[in-house]
Regions:
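Phosphate/pyrophosphate-binding catalytic cores of soluble transferases and nucleic-acid-acting enzymes
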Residues: 1-294
Length: 294
């Protein structure tokens, strides 16, 4: 899966791994968050794991700030930053350089965005891209016609600021990422998820979740995570263990589906099925090599 691939690539490209997962930041929650183990890590540095107490809120804005810092530090060491796993919106804060906590989502921005979305629906992606091409040819060369979301984001910035998008810090950030997605047939994926949940139970998830429950986990940010909140009704004696475990499996499958949908909506994701085609790993390495030479 993602963890194994990120570690393989870190060895190959002198990389360091940044976790893009909103739950792996919490200390003491190792099994339910599928946190990388010290054995798996080996000598590969990992970041943004075990940095919060269970009562702390962790936001996308905080993730972006910390991840940006780590990316800079890793790059200064001449290592390759590899962001593994992840919560869709967290990753988007990096790939789109979202200015969180600013007025980015104010009314004017929303109106401009909705206008271009409507134009794209009525006249097609190419028409919208041509408009960008006229206004900012440098940006249009770097943004694929198929990636309407980024084309609209560029038009939005141009219209709102009166400046070229290619002169904005966002422009640089949107081009500094190579997105690699792992996929496989849905039945295979779901079967793996079910088995993984069974394994978590065997490895002590019940004890971990009970500890969180005893700390008042139902009212804590960390208690919202999949694998924990489904067990709380069981600890209260309201449902059977079987029902709770089935609910974890169901929620995990839904989450995986949402993650895949998020990546599929990002036109610049490159997909590989290394479960069915293990040799695809060589293709991924070649891909990264080519990208690094750009």
């Amino acid at each position: 899966g993602k963890t194994a691939l990120s570690i393989k690539l870190a060895h190959e490209f002198d990389g360091e791994v940044i976790s893009g997962d909103s739950m792996q930041v919490y200390r003491h929650l190792d099994i339910g968050t599928a946190k990388v183990t010290p054995e798996e890590m080996g000598d590969v540095p990992h970041h943004l794991i075990d940095i919060c107490n269970i009562e702390e809120r962790f936001s996308a804005a905080r993730f972006k700030k910390l991840a940006d810092q780590k990316i800079d530090e890793i790059a200064q060491r001449n290592h390759l930053p590899i962001i593994a796993g992840g919560t869709g919106f967290y990753l988007q804060t990096l790939t789109d350089n979202l200015a969180l906590g600013s007025d980015q989502f104010d009314q004017q921005t929303l109106e401009i965005r909705n206008h271009w979305k409507k134009v794209a629906e009525e006249k097609g992606a190419e028409y919208v891209w041509e408009r960008l091409n006229k206004l900012d040819p440098v940006a249009s060369v770097r943004i694929p016609k198929s990636n309407t979301r980024r084309v609209i984001r560029a038009l939005e910035v141009i219209q709102k600021t009166g400046q070229l998008f290619s002169n904005q810090p966002q422009f640089k950030a949107t081009n500094d990422f190579l997105l690699i997605g792992l996929t496989t047939d849905r039945p295979v994926l779901y079967e793996r998820i079910n088995k993984r949940v069974d394994l978590m139970i065997q490895n002590g998830l019940l004890e971990e979740a009970k500890w969180l429950f005893d700390q008042g986990g139902e009212d804590l940010p960390a208690g919202k995570g999949i694998g924990y909140h489904e067990l709380f009704p069981y600890f209260r004696g309201e449902i059977s263990l079987n029902e709770a475990v089935e609910k974890i499996k169901q929620d995990s499958r839904h989450y995986a589906k949402r993650q895949l949908t998020w990546f599929r909506n990002k036109a610049d994701t490159h997909w590989f099925d290394i479960l069915r085609h293990p040799n695809d790993i060589n293709q991924i390495k070649q891909f990264i090599n080519d990208w690094l030479k750009k």
